[in-house]
Amino acid sequence: MFLKKLIEAKKAYTFDDVLLVPNASWVEPKDTDVSTDLAGLKLNIPIVSAAMDTVTEKEMAIALARLGGLGVIHRNMSIEEQVHQVQAVKKADEVVIKDVITVSPDDTVGEAINVMETYSISGLPVVDNEDKLVGIITHRDVKAIEDKTKKVKDVMTKDVVCAKEDVEEEEALELMYANRVERLPIVDDENRLIGIITLRDILKRRKYPQAARDKKGRLLVAAACGPHDFERAKALIEAEVDAIAIDCAHAHNMRVVENVKKFKEMLEGTDIKLIVGNIATKEAAEDLIKAGADVLKVGIGPGSICTTRVVAGVGVPQLTAVAEVADVAKEHNVPIIADGGIRYSGDIAKAIAAGADAVMLGSLLAGTDEAPGQLMVINGRKYKQYRGMGSLGAMTGGVGAGADRYFQAPAKSHMKHVKLVPEGVEGAVPYKGPVSEVVFQLIGGLRASMGYCGAKNLKEMQEKARFVIITPSGQVESHPHDIIITNEAPNYPLGK
């Protein structure tokens, strides 16, 4: 029985075990389409940032969404702080600013100036006690007025150019240019102020034509939630997050599967998607799809900072895990995210060829400006802090979300009295500058691979790409060899 179990064990593969075979191709890399659809979340690049406290907070989520990807804000923080971060992403590129700072017509000019200086703005809508727009006051209106006790209503511009809520961005821009104004108040049918559009915000949005946005034109953002944390999920739903990622080391725990059903019920009537992970088998995929998962996240122990495979002896090499889950997921039209083990851009191509619809990145993004990890200098070179959510630091820091993720979650207040068994390590990764530079190289490598494989888009990549298994000698041959590298390439860091 036991010997048979060993003999019949299947061989499993990860990224370094295979290469993609070049095909006859009419496809140029520059002409490839790398967009993907995660159950209705339309991304222009197949990159999702990891829900780790040294990878994704609002800065990373904003930057990645502007590039066309998706950030998953980690949960090792209070519910209130996570909600605040989600809202910050949503407001970053809003077309219509809803939380408008206003003044009353009976306020003094001095009071209006104080408000402008406090919030560093050069103009304010003027509304009456019914929130009806009656005028606008700007620095130009007040800069020559010496008597600061004058009323706003005596100096404001009363003939205000405004628009209705359904105004299109192009129409708003034309109105502002035609009337030489930089702010366009938005009003309802009764002239009540709803919000404001600014020229600066429209021009800023146009800098990011590939941004991943919701139906209202706001940046997409996801947030992590514990498998039993219904209170957090409720708050995230109210914050209008685009996806909730059930963040768990072993999502095929049957209590987690049962809770997925409850989370799915909470999301009824919303457009919010439920991402569930992590898993590594077809059985897990079947159970979680049945429970209501919209997107599956694959990966047990492949991450650079994860020790699950040596501490627990459990895991499946990532490429095999992705392919096995994909075979089930594709039957149900459920997309999957390959989470972990990605070291080079070629690994992204291999993950997609094996059935992934997107990849989740941790270490490749942790060294960027937008990652929240601490910047440090080691031997004269810059690094940024990076740690696994199963590390002792993540388990005991913040709100102890790392411990909860690995089913070692007492109340945070009792953490100091509990012995923990970490499944991750803490360290540092080389500083890399802005995340946009890293993403440029990663997507460039993916496009190159698609050109070699003759795939115009990711669906064709999954259909046309072919694998070949390589030997250890083949792995050595795949990397630069018989040379001392004197200039480090941006997409091939030394020391890996």
Curated annotation (Swiss-Prot):
Cofactor needs: K(+)
Pathway: Purine metabolism; XMP biosynthesis via de novo pathway; XMP from IMP: step 1/1
Keywords: CBS domain, GMP biosynthesis, Metal-binding, NAD, Oxidoreductase, Potassium, Purine biosynthesis, Repeat
Family assignment from sequence similarity: Belongs to the IMPDH/GMPR family.
Subunit structure comment from the entry: Homotetramer.
Annotated residues for binding of K(+): G301, G303, C306, E477, S478, H479
Chain residues that bind IMP: S304, D339, G340, G341, G362, S363, Y386, R387, G388, M389, G390, E423
Reaction catalysed by this enzyme: IMP + NAD(+) + H2O = XMP + NADH + H(+)
Top-level division of the source organism's lineage: Archaea
PANTHER family per UniProt: INOSINE-5'-MONOPHOSPHATE DEHYDROGENASE (PTHR11911:SF111), INOSINE-5-MONOPHOSPHATE DEHYDROGENASE RELATED (PTHR11911)
Annotated Pfam families: CBS, IMPDH
Binding residue positions for NAD(+): D247, G299, I300, G301
Residues annotated as catalytic: C306, R405
Gene Ontology biological process terms in this record: GMP biosynthetic process; GTP biosynthetic process
InterPro entries documented for this protein: Aldolase_TIM (IPR013785), CBS_dom (IPR000644), CBS_dom_sf (IPR046342), IMP_DH (IPR005990), IMP_DH/GMP_Rdtase_CS (IPR015875), IMP_DH_GMPRt (IPR001093)
Top EC class, one word: oxidoreductase
Function description: Catalyzes the conversion of inosine 5'-phosphate (IMP) to xanthosine 5'-phosphate (XMP), the first committed and rate-limiting step in the de novo synthesis of guanine nucleotides, and therefore plays an important role in the regulation of cell growth.
Gene behind the chain: guaB
Regulation affecting activity: Mycophenolic acid (MPA) is a non-competitive inhibitor that prevents formation of the closed enzyme conformation by binding to the same site as the amobile flap. In contrast, mizoribine monophosphate (MZP) is a competitive inhibitor that induces the closed conformation. MPA is a potent inhibitor of mammalian IMPDHs but a poor inhibitor of the bacterial enzymes. MZP is a more potent inhibitor of bacterial IMPDH.
Single GO term (MF): nucleotide binding
Protein name: Inosine-5'-monophosphate dehydrogenase
Segments forming domain CBS: 96-152, 156-212
EC number of this enzyme: 1.1.1.205
HAMAP family per UniProt: IMPDH
